[in-house]
Amino acid sequence: MTKKSQENISLPQGVLYCWGDKFSGKPTFNPLIPNICFMDNGYNHSLALTETGELYGWGDNRHHQLSSNKAITSIDKPIKIQVIPNQRVKSISCGGNFSAAIMENGLLYVWGTLIEGGKCTESPTKVDLLKGVTCVSIGINHCAVVADSPTTPEKRSVYTWGTNRKGQLGVVGDSITNAPRRVTLGSKAISVCCGEEFTAAIVEGNEVFVWGYNKSRQICSNNSDEIISIPVKPFLGRDIVELSCTKNYIAARSGVGNVCVWGSNEQVCRIGDDKFINFPNKIKQISASTSHILVLSEKGEIFSWGNSEDNQLSHKLDVNSSPNINSSSGTTTPTTNTTTTTKKSTLQFNNVYQLEGRNVLSVYSWGKSSGAIIEPGNFRVDIAESMRRKDNIGSPAPLFFRKLVNYLRGENSKAEGLFRLSGSMARCDDLEKRLDSNEIFPINKYEPYDAADIIKRYLKTLPEPLLTTQLCQKYEKDILNFHNNNINSNSNSSNPNNNNNNNNNNDKIENLILEWIEKLPLENRQLLIYLLSFLQEISYSQIKYQKQNAMGEKNLAIVFAPNILTRGEIGNDEIVEDMIRLLPTIMKQYPLMEDLIIIDQAQQCLRGSRIPYIIDHWIRVTKERETANNSLFKPEIIKTIINSIVECTLEIKNNQNNQNNQKENNNNNNNINNSNNNNTNNTNISPTTLSPSTLSSSQQQQSTPSSLTSSPSPSQRNSLSTGNIANSLSLSSNALFSPNFLSSSKDGNNINNNNNNNNNNNNNNNNNNSSNSSSSSGSSLSSSPNLSPTIVNRSGYSLSFSGGTPSSRDSSVNNLLNTSGGAIQSIQRQFANSGSSSNNNNSNNSPSLIGSNSSPALTFSNSSGNLIETTKLYEKVLALILSPVLPIGSIMKVLPSIFELDTNNDLFIRLLTTIKLVRTVRSNLDEFIQQQLVMIKEINQCSQFIDKAKQLNENVESVITDLLYVDESIKYWKQVQPLIQLYSQQIQSYFKWWFDLLEKSMTETEEKLFRAKKEFDKLETEKTKLEKQLNHLNSVTLETTDEQILLKKQFDQWCLINQIENCSRKIEISNQNLSRVNHDYCSIQSHFEAFKPHLLIVQEFVSIILKSVSLYIEKLDQIKSNTLQMFPQYFNAYIELIFTHHHEIKQQQQLSIIKSLAHSITLQHQLLFIENVNQSKYQISLELETKFNSLKRVILENLKDSR
């Protein structure tokens, strides 16, 4: 049992590796334990804490130390322990059969049995006498905490309770106490740590106090008393910041990162041997157990020494080495030679070599076991471990694997010999290193063959094969035997049962593969299906574009079989080929994988050259796999697609605007240089000598109007808009105005594409450092609504920006436009001044404004060819998921505006899911029927009928299908029309709400500006009047010598001067107020003008969408009305035509024509009089039905006779 002085748990979260007793001899990932940031161990139970404050426990529960309602002897898998609802756990401790947790509010809860034979606390119970608890530690039968003590000079003290047989409570006597008692230390307590039967504490100044059982001299090496009840200092001036206590010794860490151990333990330390141990690097954490110690350096190295009977040290040692004692410095420096593996005790530290290079977060030792919390790795670790990374949770494969896969999509999928030809070894090593370290970098500099090699290398170097060794041994031979049976059957061509045997074998192969996949661990299964789906993509692309040497399913199976099946085996590639072939069947069993794969494709492939590839892929797979067709229309899929389209569209627009701004800035700089050359004799250039077009953006901002008493000029408004607002305007933390961003898994897009865009952004940023580019954007406000777009970073968490523009490593866009302050603050001030108390109650009902100066529409110029091309591709993407009833162009146009208000994002997604792609009726059905009727009437001879029979049948079937669907379609669109109206009008209402709010704010601020200007003019007038009076008084010469008159004049002068000075101060204050109000007005005006086009576009969109749905319903009603009159005539002509020529066709023995007629008429009968009898009775009279049935009987008899 190990106890550590732990004040607050603020460690990063990772996976748990264990080694030693009951574990393997080397550090091994423990998949049963969730991601944790801290753990502690009692005698036979353990507690673990996550970074979100959730508590887990496992082990012995006979004393309810796991807080389980049932006294289960042992719990093997971690269970979640709820201390109190809606409260996070901040720190934990367990010892003996007792557990404790400090909550985030500083209260302490305990459960279990603290004192042997004492009362058992079955559920977490608050310790009432303690508040402000910061640290807790538990021994065998006693507990110690650091808590607030406001009535003492120290203000924070150590409190103990439990048994005191060995003096561990810090008071005289051996009584048992159940109530916390304060221990007198004389200084403010920082942390506390319990050994089995003693207690240690660190106080202010990093001094150590120890008390309790001293048999091993761990309390005081020069005191032979077995029990020391009064706290004593074992030494002075050691600067101790962390303690770890066990049964008979204490380990301590100093502030400079050295370790000191004292007490008596022949495997770790000896009495009197309390010198500091120096390590190659500074130590940041220690953990001591009964017989060994682990320490962690700042570089992530683990050093250990002590007993290694159960391989708990896990390192190699030279058994002949011994510590080197430096007598001059008083320190011990053990040697670090490693030659052989040993299980003997050693006082020499060495590193745990199996974890070299891993990012170790914390270490733990207990009993004869060791553990470490480690950041989940990528390469050469279990798949289950790598999927514990934050960026992999909820994904079908590790992030780096998905990046490689997406890089190989598109044009790279056509590379000849992909996965067969090798890449550069040096590039592959570099690529693996960068992926393993989670570096964000452009992958385009690597060849497709390099990425393909890394995929194979990753699968090959997994600790065990993807399909697991155990399952490979169980299924591989059986499946291969069935394949051999097929080969033997095919070689024996004389056997008439070959086909049946092969079918039986294939069924058995399919069943075995499905059973195999079902038994795989979840992470392995998801990665396998993701890989099979990708290999199927590569196979299709290779066969389509590589006529020779294409990497089809067979060739890919040959390459991948050694990497995912039994290693070293050959001839098992047929199994992988079968798995690729069975992908549609596999997807039916695991439809969620289809969702995850499409989401991944939508996030990564809807940009650049991969857009046509993914469109073609989605069209193909939706035809091949029903699961893909179903997934593509799910709300979360549509939401992901829309998010990706908006982000990429705004990204492209932003890059183009940046390029245009850069060119404009360069031209402006050239103009300024020319102007400077023309005015070399002038030391100062007045702003009035330069036109606004020749001023750089920075100069426009620095030049101020000579008088603020007048309204700002357009150029001044531009200088105050966009760019300045981006840094001065900030959305308040008030819920009414705080922006909430949509989440999407746009993880590190820099790694795979848009290299050129990123480089352009970087160049633009560098070029714009010397001059503010905001004026260029601002100038567009007065010219057109085509503004610089807001690039919204949508990461895994909601973001709220205030102040300066933040930087994000997850976004491929370097500049995030930030809205803030003036407009919104002004609005808030108005709400505050109005004394409204309902803001908090209504905050959730008010929309939040995301962007201020973003592009209200995608307007294209000759220079935006890339955007035009991309937009056309996006329209094709939307056409895959949205109904053609609504114009896709209108949707693309409104997208940037929709994402201006975060409240509308969800509404817009709901709207799109409502109008998702459903079957539509032919818009010119009545005209088509009329054309077919004319064609039937033109057929006079049997030869003509034979030539057109197939086309006639298909057209009749198509007309019947559309005709019967008209009623269903009308019903569907009338049902969804209110929802469409609700969502679209609600979107418009939010925009109108913001528009009205901004307009109102602008009006009120304009009134404030007028009043401020009026006040300023009034003060100026008053000052001028006083100055005139003073000048007049000064000009009057008094010829009298009367002292009283002279003194009165001086007094009048003094009064006027003071009044003028007072008035000047008021003018200065008024001028500042006028400047502020003027700036707010310009900001709100800019915001208003930027938002106005968005409202117009949204209003236009809502009008179009409502009108489109209404017109479509009207069109359906018209089609229904027209076809009710035309279809009977058309269908009767079709029947009469067949009656006219069927006898001649029979005589000519046109068996194919008779079969075609029989099949078509049977299908028509099924549609009209079986499946849709209720609808068809409105279109077909009883007489026509009788005639059709007669025709059916005749054609079927002809078919029977012909056979």
UniProtKB/Swiss-Prot annotation:
RCC1 repeats lie at residues 52-104, 106-148, 155-204, 206-255, 257-298, 299-359, 361-410. The gene is gacGG. InterPro entries: RCC1/BLIP-II, Reg_chr_condens, Rho_GTPase_activation_prot, RhoGAP_dom, Ub_ligase/GEF_domain. Keywords: Coiled coil, Cytoplasm, GTPase activation, Repeat. Disulfide bonds: none annotated. Transmembrane segments: none annotated. This is Rho GTPase-activating protein gacGG. One of its GO terms (cellular component) is cytoplasm. SMART domains: RhoGAP. Residues 381-594 form the Rho-GAP domain. Residues 649-679, 995-1078 form a coiled coil. The record marks R420 as: Arginine finger. GO terms for molecular function: GTPase activator activity. It is found in: Cytoplasm. Rho GTPase-activating protein involved in the signal transduction pathway. Its main location: cytoplasm. The keyword Repeat applies.
